[in-house]
Regions:
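An acidic, glycine-rich "communication" segment
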Residues: 36-41, 151-226, 234-243
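N-terminal secretory signal peptides that target proteins for export/translocation
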Residues: 1-8
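Bacterial N-terminal signal peptides
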Residues: 11-24
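Short alpha-beta junction capping motif
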Residues: 61, 113-152
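Solvent-exposed loop/turn segments at secondary-structure junctions
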Residues: 66-70, 119-123, 142, 147-152, ...
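Extracytoplasmic/secreted envelope proteins and their assembly/folding machinery
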Residues: 76-83, 129, 133, 151, ...
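Aromatic-Pro/Gly-enriched surface loop or interdomain linker
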Residues: 29-113, 119-120, 209, 217-253
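Surface-exposed patches in mature extracellular/periplasmic domains of secreted proteins
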Residues: 92-102, 144-147, 165-173
Length: 253
């Protein structure tokens, strides 16, 4: 199994490089087009100019900056930690820093794996809805992690995004729970109201386009250990779920 995964990892690396080159040629993207507004979070452009250039051959998760008053920036250490663990565990090169993208950015399609989180309202403009829909229909993937409080507005957003599709409960035998680790569904990192953790999604035929972790708080579990003081076992559960989602987003296996 390990040899098979390493073989797949090599294939993913090659596919990422080819896809990056194809994307740049097909869209005419320049480095300044791909760079999200404000650059990499936490990087001083004057001192780290080279860090502005996203290496499209490296796997990464792009955080979506959205309107509506919700804290789209929640769990700030989660994605850098996930990318670091993903590279360490799978052998697939991943970005070092968090990438923030707005849905109206011309470089949106350079980021096949998008991430949303928050405690409050998610509100997209009509233009953002259309661009996100086009991104997902073209093969993109969105992981939304409810940090407790965004459920109603996120479900409303999904209805606006895909009025012809349903947000459905993803069965435990789905590939997203088997892609790298064998899991029994989303973990329960933090308790809020006694409800079980759930994974919801929007399908395009056999392809999962949107994965929504609800009552799970995966992002909290991915944060630096001293943020929530979660037990090591809880953090490991969150990392494994995150790695599985990341791996599935890249391979669809």
């Amino acid at each position: 199994m390990k040899a098979l995964r390493m073989s797949r990892a090599a294939g993913v690396c090659a596919a990422l490089a080819i896809a990056a080159a194809s994307m740049a040629l097909a869209t005419g993207l320049r480095a300044q087009d791909v760079m999200p507004p404000g650059g990499y979070k936490g990087v001083d452009p004057a001192e780290h100019e080279r860090e502005k250039l996203i290496d499209l051959s490296r796997a990464h998760v792009a955080r979506v900056k959205y309107g509506g008053g919700g804290d789209w920036y929640g769990d700030p250490s989660a994605l850098p930690n996930l990318q670091r663990e993903f590279e360490k565990r799978t052998g697939i090169p991943a970005a070092n820093s968090e990438i923030v993208i707005e849905l109206g950015d011309p470089g949106l399609f350079a980021h096949p794996f998008l991430y949303m989180t928050g405690h409050g309202t998610v509100k997209l403009t009509r233009d953002e809805i259309e661009k996100l829909r086009a991104h997902l229909v073209a093969g993109g993937f969105l992981w939304a992690d409810d940090c407790y409080g965004m459920d109603a507005s996120f479900r409303s957003m999904v209805k606006e995004l895909f009025p012809e599709r349903e947000l459905v409960l993803i069965p435990l035998e789905h590939g997203i729970y088997r892609s790298f680790y064998t899991l029994e569904g989303p973990p329960k990192i933090h308790e809020h109201d006694g409800r079980p953790p759930q994974g919801w999604g929007v399908m395009d035929g056999e392809r999962l386009m949107i994965f929504y972790t609800y009552e799970s708080d995966v992002g909290d579990g991915l944060e630096d250990a001293d943020v929530h003081n979660d037990a090591a076992g809880k953090r490991e559960q969150a990392i494994r779920m995150g790695v599985n989602i990341f791996y599935y987003a890249l391979t669809r296996e």
